[in-house]
A protein has these predicted regions:
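Hydrophobic alpha/beta core scaffold segments
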Residues: 1-451
Length: 451
């Protein structure tokens, strides 16, 4: 009802996209500067923040709605590739009415924040090859009971879908891509051996020293020298991340199941992923440093921006939110998300678009946009690389098992000879032992020849 009323307030040709949030971010109320970037969201709130863009900034826009097939996702039985293919087929059917060039076009994306499908979407996008541009945005938010989350796609409120705004900029407009995380990588990492991508839980990892599969919680407690009872307290100062092209993509913990010894995440973790432990840092100074570095080679200030800010940044830094003044002179808006997108799914991160008016496009530089072809290739091959890691892990475990069998062969042969000696007077038993010995020797030779 609310979304329909908002839509009806604008001319029919105006495209309106709305999302539920876990809190809103905004620097200006029309022409009045606000005291805090973060709107209050501790108690039930009914804020509506609207951000509009004129035809002087945006040349063309196409709204694409993609089904995610995520209804009852944790109980579904279709294979991973079947799920990717279903989403990819929906993408291949899309009508894209203009040519996509990554220098002036991007895909601002909002994914159903309760669908557990952000990575499935991105993998399908790269497999389809239909959107060769920046994929940036976030997952729709909502109350922290995680019961409802909606996206309005200019026509209706939707669930279990992703809404992509394919936006082409005017010739005198440029966009820059900003990313900020308040963490640093430690020396500790885990190679995932057993996980569930649908409920986003991890059960076991590979012990690098002995090529043994061990419980993730046990391994983590061992490395940090803490008890099960203290694990949640110790983890309060840490989170996890994968690494793509030397950049961290955070995977935040959603729950620690002490009884069943498993850890759940707000992003899916795959068998074969290399998961790094990262330590949290103070977020105000880090955001300031990141934005200073981002702005260093830009000759003008941005005329506006869109922020996708993880709900965990709001929750973990609640006492310092009002101290963040980095963007106070820039007209921008955004929301606290249930996850972010920047090429791949990510947590505990601020991803943002800033817009610039330029006279000569050759004078504008953005590290992300100028190196986009390289980054796109890394995002696209991430999923293939993950498959390679799976096979490498299987090969490691298989080799370890074979080596263990090889070590046991002499002992087993000795045992057979002892049995033969004990029962040498029993004709029938003797025949069985001879037959077993021949089979074992053949098995042994086959194994050794294949190692």
């Amino acid at each position: 009802i609310v979304s329909k009323k908002i839509k009806s307030s604008f001319p029919s040709e105006t495209k309106v996209i709305l999302t539920t949030t876990a809190g809103e971010l905004c620097t200006f109320d029309l022409n009045t500067k606000k005291d805090s970037l973060y709107h209050e969201a501790n108690n039930p709130w009914q804020n509506i923040v609207l951000q509009s863009f004129s035809e002087d900034i945006i040349d063309k826009i196409e709204i694409l709605t993609i089904p995610l097939f995520s209804e009852n996702i944790t109980s579904q039985t279709i294979s991973h590739q079947e799920r990717i293919n279903k989403i990819k087929n929906e993408i291949l059917r899309l009508n894209i009415p203009f040519k996509i060039n990554h220098t002036d076009c991007f895909a601002l994306t909002i994914v159903d924040g309760l669908s557990n499908s952000e990575s499935f979407l991105t993998e399908a996008v790269y497999e389809s090859g239909r959107l060769p541009c920046l994929l940036i945005g976030g997952s729709s938010g909502g109350k922290l009971d995680f019961q409802e989350s909606y996206i309005f796609n200019n026509e209706q409120a939707t669930r279990h879908k992703a809404v992509i705004m394919l936006i082409k900029m005017k010739k005198n407009m440029k966009y820059g891509v900003f990313k900020s995380q308040s963490c640093e990588k430690t020396d500790l990492s885990f190679l995932i051996a057993q996980s569930n991508m649908l409920n986003r839980s991890v059960q076991s990892v590979l012990n690098s020293k002995g090529n043994r599969i061990v419980n993730f919680v046990d391994a983590f407690c061992h490395h940090l020298n803490c008890s099960l009872a203290d694990l949640k307290t110790v983890l309060a100062d840490y989170t996890f991340a994968i690494e793509v092209d030397n950049e961290l993509y955070i995977r935040s913990v959603s729950n620690i199941d002490i009884e069943n010894k498993s850890i759940s995440f707000f992003c899916d973790i795959s068998f074969g992923d290399l998961l790094y432990l990262v330590k949290n840092k103070e977020f105000v100074s880090q955001t300031n440093i990141d934005f200073k570095n981002f702005s260093a080679r830009k000759k003008s200030k941005p005329i506006g921006g869109i922020l996708n800010d993880c709900i965990l940044r709001r929750l973990l830094n609640a006492k310092n939110l009002n101290s963040l003044k980095t963007f106070e002179d820039i007209p921008l808006a955004g929301f606290s998300t249930f996850g972010e997108l920047l090429g791949l799914n990510i947590n505990q991160t601020l991803t943002a678009l800033f817009f610039y008016e330029v006279e000569n496009e050759e004078d504008f530089y953005d590290e992300y946009v100028d190196n986009f072809v390289h980054k796109y290739a890394k995002f696209s091959t991430y999923f293939t690389q993950r498959e390679i890691h799976k096979y490498q892990l299987i090969a490691k475990v298989r080799t370890a098992v074979i080596n263990s069998l090889k070590d046991a062969f002499p002992l087993i042969k000795d045992m057979v000879e002892i049995l033969n000696y004990i029962y040498e007077d029993t004709t029938q038993t003797n025949k069985l032992i001879v037959e077993m010995t021949k089979k074992f020797e053949k098995f042994s030779n086959d194994i050794v020849s294949n190692v």
